Amino acid sequence: MSELIQNVKASFEQVLGYAPSHIIQAPGRVNLIGEHTDYNDGFVLPCAINYQTVVAAAKREDNIVRVVSVDYGNAVDEFDITQAITFQQDKMWANYIRGVVKCLLARGYQFTGADISVSGNVPQGAGLSSSAALEVVIGQTFKVLFNLEISQAEIALNGQQAENEFVGCNCGIMDQMISAEGRENHAMLLDCRSLETEAVSMPEDMAVVIINSNKKRGLVDSEYNTRRQQCEEAARIFGVKALRDVTIEQFNEKVAELDEMVAKRARHVITENDRTVEAAQALRAHDMKRMGELMAESHASMRDDFEITVKEIDTLVEIVKEVIGDQGGVRMTGGGFGGCIVALVPPALVDDVKAEVEAKYQAATGLKESIYVCQAQNGAGLVEVL
């Protein structure tokens, strides 16, 4: 993170002409288990990772917000918080920031303008929530600069609202919540219905290894929407608000009445919810053998029932599983049809995992992977006062 801090400080001074007063960060995240459960009111188990979005900031006495984006060649966006805050077609990055500020104002928070320089190293397009980290770090920045009475959960909800309503992208609450509330060496069990969170301790030093298949994700939006509709149809047939409310026993009693495809989709969600709650218990007990079994079952369910994995992802999972055996776990993570796998790997096996993947994945698929070795990190907060 030190390089990011240097970059935002330098660009702040270079473009805005004076030194910032505060450094703030918010992390990206990876979901350990609980896939496609969020929009079914279910459970997820993500952790924050040591890839962050970092802001250098200072407050202004007037109502102008100026933002410098280091990652877009020091591009600048400027707006007045007393005027209508509008969507920028030609500066997509700026809309996340505008949206967060607009939503904070709509929630009744009072503040003046600010100068902000922002940069991140959360890999974009890998499904590690670079956009949520940006939304959360901006909310955190206004909290810090103006001593706003806003909880971490509300910073997360405000970010989600900005993404849904201002940017116009549908997302659940998981990404913002873990970025805002993560804890070092812990995962977070999140109930997507009540928004209750619970910190779940992880074995000390356990590496969180994320491997991007670099498979271009086609069809992901249309397939995602289809899965969502199938889950809603299943919930309707069971007469419940969401599949969260169906037990596996109830499912088995009624499975014959369901369309075969709808049944497969529903079975994934119902069993995945149970697995996620049990995974939190296994992780807390540092029972990596059981955690590994649950992650393997999750992957098989995504592959066979939810049908969202692809050959490249299955290949990566098999390569990693051979190395870690029952000392850790591995599965696809994210929406599917490409993207990443996540593995919980004992530190002593990290180099072996990397070596095996580098030796076998490209040979099998023709694609070159990207490997990120992470640790579970703290969520958003103040890094330093300058």
Swiss-Prot record:
Annotated active site: 175
Sequence positions that bind ATP: 69, 125-131
Any Gene Ontology biological process: galactose metabolic process
GO annotations of cellular component type: cytosol
Coiled-coil blocks: none
Record-stated family: Belongs to the GHMP kinase family. GalK subfamily.
Role noted for this protein: Catalyzes the transfer of the gamma-phosphate of ATP to D-galactose to form alpha-D-galactose-1-phosphate (Gal-1-P).
Name of protein: Galactokinase
Protein source organism: Vibrio parahaemolyticus serotype O3:K6 (strain RIMD 2210633)
Lineage: Bacteria, Pseudomonadati, Pseudomonadota, Gammaproteobacteria, Vibrionales
